[in-house]
């Protein structure tokens, strides 16, 4: 028995959006597979992490646009003999032009419940992602633009902050929220 255990390294990419006041994550179903998964790629010997992230993202995004995205580390964990590294992919203009290709059967946005029902994320892992999102937005309130559409009403923006659990007394009254937004910008 070999005392040195080797691990593979898998990089998962999370495309996240707030759709109908709920945080959702993009999942894919590859052809010939009967399960959903996150866009991912396996780390090869001479790979750099950014290249692996781009390779995972290229499953659903055209290669031409990959340079316009940022990748932020959420967490990592060991699952049997596989180390999973999780990144959120960000785009300032919130534009994702997803492509269907011959490797994919379907793509979809899953809420917390659907992610748990399909055994994609445990509640603990989903909470880590939500916590990351909250902290990312709290670090700079303008970061909310990474998760919502470019066109939104003041009420939608206000609800988004509240639904993310970013509690600030100014968020609950529209007049105060408007003043707070003006000060932030």
Placement of each model-derived feature along the sequence:
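Conserved Nudix-box catalytic region and its N-terminal flanking loop in Nudix hydrolases
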Residues: 22-62, 140-153, 158, 162
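Generic "edge-of-domain/loop-turn" microfeature
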Residues: 20, 33, 94-96, 114
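Charge-enriched amphipathic alpha-helical scaffolds
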Residues: 168-185
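N-terminal strand-loop-strand
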Residues: 1-37
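NUDIX/MutT-family hydrolases
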Residues: 88, 97-137, 147-160, 176-178
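Active-site segment of metal-dependent pyrophosphate-handling enzymes
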Residues: 2, 7-11, 24, 50-54, ...
């Amino acid at each position: 028995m070999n005392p040195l255990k080797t691990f593979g390294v898998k990089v998962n990419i999370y495309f996240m959006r707030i759709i109908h006041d709920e945080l959702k994550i993009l999942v894919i179903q590859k052809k010939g597979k009967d399960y959903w998964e996150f866009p991912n790629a396996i780390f090869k010997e001479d790979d750099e992490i950014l290249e692996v992230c781009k390779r995972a993202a290229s499953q659903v995004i055209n290669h031409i646009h990959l340079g316009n995205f940022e990748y932020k580390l959420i967490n990592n964990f060991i699952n049997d003999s596989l180390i999973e590294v999780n990144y959120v992919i960000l785009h300032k203009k919130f534009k994702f032009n997803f492509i269907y290709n011959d490797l994919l059967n379907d793509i979809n946005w899953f809420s917390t419940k659907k992610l748990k029902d399909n055994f994609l994320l445990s509640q603990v892992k989903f909470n880590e992602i939500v916590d990351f999102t909250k902290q990312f937005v709290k670090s700079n309130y303008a970061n909310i633009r990474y998760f919502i559409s470019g066109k939104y009403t003041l009420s939608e923006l206000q609800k988004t902050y509240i639904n993310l659990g970013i509690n600030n007394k100014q968020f609950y009254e529209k007049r105060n929220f408007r003043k707070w937004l003006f000060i932030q910008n």
